[in-house]
Amino acid sequence: MTYSSDTVTPTTLGTGTTEARLNTDSPIQVPDGISNIVSAIPYFVPVGVFTPDESYLVRVRMQSNDISVEPCRFMMSGVNTGDAAFTSVQAPILQEYSMNIPNANGANMNIYGQCLTTNTAAPFLGCELVYSTGSTGSQQYWNTPDSISTGGTTINTRTTLNTITITDGREITSIGMVVTPTTAAASTHDVGEAEFTSSDFQVPFPYKFPIAPSFSGLGAAANQLTNPNGLSRQKFPAGHGIPLAPRALINSFYTNRDAKGVGSKVVPFLSFTR
């Protein structure tokens, strides 16, 4: 088995929240001889100034008219800025999202990006696809809620987030959450726990884990530096995930462990097999 990879042309997502197709609004064609899309690795390409109190919070969607892909919507790592004349922005590591999409030979893939918050300076987004000539495991499907949620302002507030529905799922293979500040302020941090529950889980166990924390410094120009991971994700080995009912409604929650002047933006996401 041989591996290969290709990238799309980085494309602007605009300053609003409208979904944009990458590769300058064109599909990327999988090469002949490739049978499997192993994974996707999206990446930010900032080309303008970052703006105070404007974080990057972006969802990626993959679609094809040639092969079965959807649902395939997942969250990128968040990127935080700071307050007033902040001096630096920290880039998170690249995240790889397992796909294992079969029958990909010659298929046209459409890759979309969507900012879930507005930005004064439009971010650009690129994406790498990793290919193989053989199977690399069960196909992974991804989903998020349709819209973002806002966390609490009072310390220790447990916020109910928007739900995710899975149809014809066999097991959840990962659960994750992205939290980015709406407004950065000195000595005000994003810390806390994510929690996933459902009466459609076929096991009675808890699924709770810490978010990727980010901390703010002192002064009016406080930076709230991005966590190196940019998101928090719990992965389960194949065959050892969360077993599901044929149709499952997934609830999620975020508990903020520090007071916030303005609630942070929160988006859960997950992957599953069929």
Task: Report residues per predicted region.
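Beta-strand-centric surfaces of beta-sandwich/beta-rich domains
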Residues: M1-R274
